[in-house]
Amino acid sequence: MVARFGCQKTTTKEKHHCAYSIGPPYRRWIVENAKRKGKIMDNGNKKGNFIGLLPLIIFIALYIISTAITGDAGTMPLNVGILIAIIFAFIFCRKKCKADGLKFDDMVTSFCKGGGDDTLILMFFIFLEAGIFYCVAGGMGAVASVSNLGLKLLPANMVLPGLFLIGCVLSFSMGTSMGTVTALMPIGIDIAAKTGMSLPLVCGIVVSGAMFGDNLSFISDTTIAATRTQEVQMKDKFKANFLMVLPAVIITFVLCIFQSSAASLDKSTLTWNLVQLLPYVLVIVLSLMGVHVILAMGAAIVAGLVIGIAQGSFTLVTALATVGDGIKCMEDTAAIAVMVGGLVALMSYLGGIDWLLNKLTKRVKSSRGAELSIAALVTLLDLATTNNTISIITAGPIAKDISDEFSVSRVRTASILDLFSSAGNGVCPWAGQILAAAGLAGVSTLSIVPFCWYSILMFVFGIFFILIGWPKGLSSNNAKNAEKAAK
């Protein structure tokens, strides 16, 4: 990071005393902008200021209050909540800017440059590609082929473990937990009806499988957010993350076997097409080869469109409409990422980021404590917003500072951010995944949570591996990691 922005190397102690040498790119932009005007837009308080966190607290409070009143986490759209927080941030900044001799234009410029961070803009386009891929794959029949192939190959008494594994494969291929829940719940409900299994149990298994890919997939928005905010390569984060969740996968699979019962599933109605699997195979293979995610998803999208048109799933016109639908389904998330970037820039100027960083690290004396503080931060943000991507984007800059301060590998930091945010979404009764499963199955969200075994075990093993410092051997050379990720 130091080499990238041309800053002079600073010591750990000096890091928090030089706004130009630390933190995300928005701090550099703020300072450069102020320098051009002969002013330094610095918060002036090296320990930070709690006022800088008020916009975020207002957002969380509004979200929790609206959810508590209506019982629906979707009552207040995230973009509206963040917009309100941004308005308050500008109000709080106005007084400080006046005292510092800066104008409203300076705040707007800093906000725009915070939202225009190269990491966020790249993330913006990757999110749009992920939405296009999801809609194209669904429209040309790839989703149904993947699900049916898995069920057809499994013995009847392995249906429940198989449902979990199919959820893992499907979510890893699609990169979306919501898409996986939507695709598998109809199958899960049918299995429950035929075998007499508990509906909440089946819902919990589907959600568990969905959260596997949400956490690990190369095209998951959480993976994209975690790796881009920490400036590490996806394959490095995948290796570290997979080792940390592997015990949770194994134990969940074993629990499914014990809960499973013989089922007479009519497999003659399950059809699949080998050619339709190509987009999923392509995106997984290219990603594992280290091909940039934009190129990997682009190739898979083109393959899906070509196959869909050739098989009659799309016409040229409907293919374009499907691409448009994909953009629409992710444009909210993409826009929110940019809004959060601008909000965090203003919060940083107010001293909120430094205050939170100071409080989180005040009593931290080791890399282990730093990792636990990062895990706690992203989990709390996720439970409050029920959006693991936004929680990672918000916590990412702070986590990067903490990891640099205590020599924690950014690869490990990215893994912790993604693991704990996904685990939080997988057990939160008002999160979208559980709400979707409960709505389709007609059961209570709270009845599903105890059966979300994988997400619960993610918490258990995530904390356990932080405490024992495993997996070992991860590079702590964060500058080198950043250079690799930038290529």
Language-model features, listed with the residues they occupy:
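Structural signal for alpha-helical transmembrane segments and their membrane-water exit/capping regions
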Residues: 48-105, 126-140, 174, 258-259, ...
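Juxtamembrane helix-boundary/capping and inter-helix hinge elements in multi-pass membrane proteins
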Residues: 100-102, 116-117, 196-200, 225-237, ...
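Membrane-interfacial loop-to-helix junctions in multi-pass transporters
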Residues: 117-123, 147-165, 192-202, 270-278, ...
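Alpha-helical transmembrane segments of multi-pass membrane proteins
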Residues: 157-170, 196-213, 369-382, 406-427, ...
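Hydrophobic alpha-helical transmembrane segments of multi-pass integral membrane proteins
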Residues: 124-133, 153-187, 361-400, 417
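Juxtamembrane and boundary regions of transmembrane helices in multi-pass small-molecule transporters
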Residues: 7, 208-211, 215-270, 275, ...
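Core transmembrane alpha-helical segments of multi-pass membrane transporters/permeases
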Residues: 79, 83, 91, 106-141, ...
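Interfacial loop-to-helix junctions that mark the boundaries of transmembrane helices
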Residues: 45-48, 69-81, 114-117, 150-155, ...
